[in-house]
């Protein structure tokens, strides 16, 4: 059976697993305990993944085996029957957002055939991304943010003042923000959740033209699977703060520590991307409870055919 067909057969079960994680985390929205919210999502997602007919392996997860008791890198999930699948996940993207009752918290999981996702260490990653419909090579991580803004504006036939760039709100990004604004472009700051930021470039209604900045490498691979599904562009480079992080990268098999990865190296084969809203956000609505029922909204993307679906599910509370 083809890779695309295998992933298609897993899609609805993947949605169910992400929904379960989102619902579990939603019980802790606004309660100020991000660790408890994350653990609730982890427990529910792991249960859902283990019910799926696949030989699954976590390649992007909650950390190394000695750091995370569940959904650790290398953990095998699924029933043990079916296709060999690599999985990247973030059971609760936006733990702080959830704890504070803020927007854009998601339960996120991606699937690809074995070997189809970059085995990225849990370090930082410099990233730049745009959505579909732009000339190949329009962005370059080695150019300044302002030069990339100019290139995008030129490709779209608009002024740089019409370009909006999404950046995580971090002190380390102050120079990036200043450079973007120096050419008149607008900056939308995200308090947390750079998977959401990257994916926003693919959805016209968000008004986001480009994402740039430094965030987690695992989140970079997750976001890359979504972009691959819809034809966006992305470049990334691992960023190491110390020798321990370099050693961690070597352990995952990365040889060239300065390599600039393009989208097809981050996610090299057919992909399935699933994100269920925990709190209301730009991509999907959050979990809602009303009149004895629970409703969820899930964004699902498939690289085969560049298919994007929104699935709304209602179940008894």
Roles of regions detected by a PLM:
Residues 143-293, 297-302:
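An extended, acidic
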Residues 11, 15, 138, 142, ...:
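Short acidic-aromatic active-site loops that bind/stabilize oxyanions
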Residues 77-78, 107-110, 207-211:
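Short basic, glycine-rich beta-strand/loop surfaces that mediate nucleic-acid
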Residues 7-11, 32, 96, 135-137, ...:
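A short glycine/serine-rich beta->alpha loop
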Residues 82-93, 97-118:
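DPxDG-like acidic metal-binding loop motif
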Residues 17, 21, 103, 218-222:
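Catalytic-loop motifs flanking and including active-site residues across diverse enzymes
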Residues 1-88, 147-150, 154, 195-196, ...:
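N-terminal subdomain of lithium-sensitive/metallo-dependent phosphomonoesterases centered on the IMPase/IPPase/PAP
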Residues 112-136, 140:
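Flexible glycine-/small-residue-enriched beta->alpha junction loops
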């Amino acid at each position: 059976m083809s890779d695309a067909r295998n992933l298609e057969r897993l899609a609805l079960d993947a949605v169910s697993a992400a929904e379960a994680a989102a619902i579990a985390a939603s019980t802790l929205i606004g309660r100020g305990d991000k660790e408890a919210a994350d653990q609730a999502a982890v427990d529910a997602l792991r249960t859902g993944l283990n019910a799926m007919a696949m030989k699954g392996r976590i390649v992007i997860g909650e950390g190394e085996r000695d750091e995370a008791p569940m959904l650790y890198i290398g953990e095998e999930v699924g029933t043990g029957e079916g296709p060999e699948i690599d999985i990247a996940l973030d059971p609760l993207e936006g733990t702080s957002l959830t704890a504070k009752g803020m927007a854009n918290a998601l339960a996120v999981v991606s699937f690809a055939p074995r070997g189809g996702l970059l085995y990225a260490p849990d370090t930082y990653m410099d990233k730049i991304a745009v959505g579909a419909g732009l000339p190949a090579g329009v962005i370059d991580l080695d150019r300044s943010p302002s030069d990339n803004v100019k290139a995008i504006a030129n490709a779209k036939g608009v002024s740089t003042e019409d370009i909006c760039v999404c950046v995580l709100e971090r002190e380390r990004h102050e120079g990036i923000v200043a450079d973007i604004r120096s050419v008149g472009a607008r900056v939308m700051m995200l308090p947390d959740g750079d998977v959401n930021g990257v994916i926003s470039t693919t959805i016209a209604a968000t008004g986001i033209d480009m994402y740039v900045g430094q965030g987690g490498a695992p989140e970079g691979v997750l976001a890359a699977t979504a972009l691959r599904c819809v034809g966006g562009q992305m470049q990334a480079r691992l960023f190491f703060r110390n020798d321990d992080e370099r050693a961690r990268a070597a352990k995952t098999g990365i040889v060239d520590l300065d390599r600039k990865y393009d989208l097809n190296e981050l996610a090299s084969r057919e992909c399935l991307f699933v994100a269920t809203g925990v709190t209301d956000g730009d991509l999907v609505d959050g979990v809602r409870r009303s009149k004895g029922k629970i409703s969820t909204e899930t964004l699902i993307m498939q690289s085969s055919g560049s298919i994007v679906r929104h699935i709304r599910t209602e179940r008894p509370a």
